[in-house]
Amino acid sequence: MTEFFMGLGLSYEWAWGISTIAGILLIALPLMLGVAMIIYADRKIWAAMALRRGPNVVGPLGLLQSFADGLKVFLQETIIPTAANKGLFLIAPIITFTVALMAWAVIPFNSGAVLANINVGLLYVLAISSLGVYGVVIAGWSSNSKYPFFSAMRASAQMISYEVSIGFILICVVLWAGTFNLNDIVKAQQSHVWIINGFVANPLLFPMWVMFLISGMAETARAPFDLTEAESELVAGYQTEYSSMAFALYWLGEYANVLLMCALNAVLFWGGYLPPLDIPVLYLVPGFVWLLLKILFFFFIFSWVKATVPRYRYDQLMRLGWKVFLPVSLLFVFLVSGYLMATGHFA
């Protein structure tokens, strides 16, 4: 895109700046539209599981319900508790929302179609996604209320606990692919096992995908790991004191993170923008379509689990992360490393 603007007579600096802004808009605007649609889909799936109809009034089939909700919160007043730290209280949801968007910069939507094709893309995702907990912790502390504070403590412990096992899982992927570049990781999955595109067909990496999927639910605080928003215990958790657009930013950030986790499942284990099978006719379908279908598939799994699995207790959540996922993921790091060294394919 930079070359295109340079061809119009612009200097490199101007062309790079305009192309970067255009790339950000090309990702951010469809992402926000996608978030609105998956909120609608989430409510529809949850309703279907409970034998209800779900949103069905605003627009055809209720498709405009999310936009109506957005307009409603936009017109509401932002109420700040008198005892709250005003500056931190308002900046916390902005941090969560901004961090959720920044992580998408390195997701490859097709071969070469990525905003920032950096060599440490996976490390970038880990670093940026780790910053999301600051928005939650700041909200819990600045609200000066016991329910948000308890929620913030839970959120920090939960996210840190599962980031450790996620790190070991991603080490297995990096060892096999030999790179931190997400685009190269996708290419390394082509015909990985026979004609199957994806590390998920690998017996050593399939358990890692299952653990990554579950850890992703815990990392994004989705049910059954939504201990930070346990209504029966913490009202609405760290969001209890929020209203209007500040509350909406948390919702947008939460669902953007869920979509990001679905995209990472697709990119790291299911071949990303590659078709499921390495068959020439399947490559006629554009790569971004395959990636979108995989993201929707994983989002359905997230919603399905949310509607069917009861919430974990806090001690069960910690036990699963530290006593099950951590040792198992560490064991598989040794297994994958040993296999690659024994077969002479160590990257």
Curated annotation (Swiss-Prot):
It is an enzyme of class 7 (translocase). It is found in: Cell inner membrane. PROSITE patterns: COMPLEX1_ND1_2. It is a multi-pass membrane protein. GO terms for biological process: aerobic respiration. The keyword tRNA processing does not apply. Keywords: Cell inner membrane, Cell membrane, Membrane, NAD, Quinone, Translocase, Transmembrane, Transmembrane helix, Ubiquinone. One of its GO terms (cellular component) is plasma membrane. GO terms for molecular function: NADH dehydrogenase activity; oxidoreductase activity, acting on NAD(P)H, quinone or similar compound as acceptor; quinone binding. The chain crosses the membrane at residues 21-41, 87-107, 120-140, 160-180, 194-214, 259-279, 282-302, 324-344. It catalyses: a quinone + NADH + 5 H(+)(in) = a quinol + NAD(+) + 4 H(+)(out). NDH-1 shuttles electrons from NADH, via FMN and iron-sulfur (Fe-S) centers, to quinones in the respiratory chain. The immediate electron acceptor for the enzyme in this species is believed to be ubiquinone. Couples the redox reaction to proton translocation (for every two electrons transferred, four hydrogen ions are translocated across the cytoplasmic membrane), and thus conserves the redox energy in a proton gradient. This subunit may bind ubiquinone. NCBIfam families: PRK06076.1-2, PRK06076.1-6. NDH-1 is composed of 14 different subunits. Subunits NuoA, H, J, K, L, M, N constitute the membrane sector of the complex. Belongs to the complex I subunit 1 family. This is NADH-quinone oxidoreductase subunit H. The lineage of its organism: Bacteria, Pseudomonadati, Pseudomonadota, Alphaproteobacteria, Sphingomonadales.
